[in-house]
Regions:
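RNA-contacting regions in translation and RNA-metabolism proteins
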Residues: 1-378
């Protein structure tokens, strides 16, 4: 009978620096050690199989107590006459020299040479940890800014692309700061930004990407106006006054509908502030953009009439079906109601959600002429 074959167990890779790094990641960045160790195991397994393409099954054993890693190639125990694949099979007689308990169909773990495994583990472990740090930082930045969606943040202009006019902003501080790009289409027309300038922006969305979180910001979004009013008007911040809707053409004019359930509170007066100070501060921040504050009404006709300010309204006739209406205004205020290049009517339509057909008081249309909702308001 053959003597039992002594197969030396691998001493394993004593890599305390890897374990220490994983402990640091868990403590300081909140990344579980088990999560990172799984990534290291996956990386070293992939690397070994890349160098040994014929090997099918490899496992890595983690000895946390002694801070060691051990790698084994798994081989199936087969009969002598069926033995054809030395990379993935071991004859039963050879297996029994390792341990008499092995039978055909069992799996034997064959230790991988320490020197080779050490080279693979050290290199791949380091790369995984570096990548883990990057992912942790990206994750922290994403979590930080994802919680600030639809909020206002202040950024510092760091660069302006002379070709696209896109503005790079540094938002946040320290490890949780990141670059955000203010595209030309999200900039207020006519507004000139310069490097070093502090700028308030509205966070439209935060997305994950392979290069880190992408923060989509805007200076033209109606949400910027709403958040600015929340900062300036305590009654909006605490919910006493509610912003019902906003229509905006950035850099030119905004219409905002407000309402309060408290009959003792004037929602328009609260937004304007003493001597107009509150609204003036927002106009300054928006570089002179005009702001019309409208009192919202659950009666569509009243709301539409108010939305067409500063024009007076004689009558509002609602369509029987759909969201459309015809508004009659004094002849001498037709141009005022429509506004320059149709802006006043356009903003009123967006604010109310109704298609508005404006006619002068001298309009001679048929009394029963149908009001048609021809197209949705954009």
């Amino acid at each position: 009978m053959k003597g039992k074959k002594k197969v030396k167990e691998p001493a394993g890779m004593n890599i305390p620096e890897i374990f220490a790094a994983l402990a640091m990641l868990e403590k300081e960045r909140g990344i579980p050690q088990t999560f990172m160790m799984d990534k290291i195991i996956q990386a070293v397994t992939t690397a070994y199989k890349r160098d040994h393409k014929d090997v099918e099954n490899v496992i890595v054993d983690v000895d946390e107590e002694h801070q060691r890693l051990k790698m084994y190639v798994q081989k199936n125990v087969v009969a002598e006459e069926d033995y054809v694949d030395p990379f993935n099979e071991i004859p039963v007689e050879e297996a029994k020299t390792i341990s008499a308990r092995y039978e055909i169909g069992d799996v034997v773990n064959i230790p991988v040479d320490n020197t080779e495994f050490g080279r693979i583990a050290a290199g791949n472990g380091k790369q995984v940890i570096i990548q883990g740090l990057r992912e942790a930082e990206r994750g922290m930045v994403y979590d930080e800014f994802n919680s600030k969606q639809h909020e206002i943040l202040t950024g510092v202009v760091t660069r302006i692309d002379p070709r696209t006019n896109a503005v790079s902003l540094r938002i946040g501080t320290g490890t949780e700061s990141t670059e955000a790009l203010l595209l030309s289409g999200e900039q207020v027309p006519g507004e000139e930004l310069v490097e070093g300038q502090h700028v308030k922006v509205y966070v439209v969305d935060v997305r994950r990407s392979t290069r880190g979180p992408q923060i989509l910001i805007s200076r033209t979004h109606p949400g910027l106006v709403k958040r600015l009013f929340e900062l300036e008007v305590p009654e909006i911040y605490n919910g006493t006054v509610e912003v019902k809707s906003i229509a905006r053409e950035a850099g030119s004019r905004t219409k905002m509908a407000v309402w309060s359930a408290d009959e003792n509170v004037d929602p328009i007066g609260a937004c304007v502030g003493p001597k107009g100070q509150r609204v003036a501060a927002i106009v300054d921040e928006l570089r002179g953009e005009k702001i019309d504050i409208i009192k919202w009404s659950e009666d569509p006709a009243q709301f539409i009439a108010a939305a067409l300010a500063p024009s007076d309204v004689v009558d509002v006739m609602m369509a029987e079906e759909g969201k459309a209406c015809r508004v009659i205004v004094p002849d001498d205020q037709l141009s005022l109601a429509i506004g320059k290049e149709g802006q006043n009517a356009r903003l009123a339509a967006r604010l109310t959600g109704y298609k508005i057909d404006i006619k002068p008081e001298s309009y001679q249309g048929e009394d029963d002429e149908e009001i048609v909702d021809e197209e949705p308001v954009q």
